[in-house]
Amino acid sequence: MKLQLVAVGTKMPDWVQTGFTDYLRRFPKDMPFELLEIPAGKRGKNADIKRILEREGEQMLAAVGKGNRIVTLDIPGTRWETPQLAQQLERWKQDGRDVSLLIGGPEGLAPECKAAAEQSWSLSPLTLPHPLVRVLVAESLYRAWSITTNHPYHRE
């Protein structure tokens, strides 16, 4: 199974790149994790936000591999505690399909992305900066993997 993070935004601060890459390199070869960045639509005073969101959504869905399970990152999604996420990761592995996790831009996810999703995951009831979400998702999935393989990274 391959994990794919599809995120709006291409110009991340160095700390995001450093943090995300640190977890990315830890994933085992049998569970590769990749990042696909979608350029954010140009926002300005007179921008058509609805159209920008629609375009970003189209690009996100086009980046998702055929047959992939789509999981959106969204506040109203399901909140998993770490052991529950580990169980979810095991179910995804048993399913045999690759998993695409979608992170929207400043206005969130396009309705088309939400409609295409099989699951929605909420990291927190707080609104989090999208760059930070990349690092949190990578760390959370790595921690979940460590639980499923009895790796010493996670401690109770």
Swiss-Prot record:
Amino-acid positions noted as binding S-adenosyl-L-methionine in the UniProt annotation, renumbered to this chain: 73, 104, 123-128
Gene source species: Pectobacterium carotovorum subsp. carotovorum (strain PC1)
Subunit structure: Homodimer.
Any Gene Ontology CC annotation: cytoplasm
Main subcellular location of this protein, as a coarse class: cytoplasm
Protein known as: Ribosomal RNA large subunit methyltransferase H
Cellular compartments annotated: Cytoplasm
EC class (word): transferase
EC number: 2.1.1.177
Keyword vocabulary terms for this entry: Cytoplasm, Methyltransferase, rRNA processing, S-adenosyl-L-methionine, Transferase
Keyword Nucleotide-binding on entry: no
Reaction(s) catalysed by this chain's protein: pseudouridine(1915) in 23S rRNA + S-adenosyl-L-methionine = N(3)-methylpseudouridine(1915) in 23S rRNA + S-adenosyl-L-homocysteine + H(+)
Membership in a protein family: Belongs to the RNA methyltransferase RlmH family.
Signal peptide limits: none
PANTHER family in the cross-refs: METHYLTRANSFERASE, RIBOSOMAL RNA LARGE SUBUNIT METHYLTRANSFERASE H
KW Transcription regulation (keyword) present: no
Gene Ontology molecular function: rRNA (pseudouridine-N3-)-methyltransferase activity
Protein's job: Specifically methylates the pseudouridine at position 1915 (m3Psi1915) in 23S rRNA.
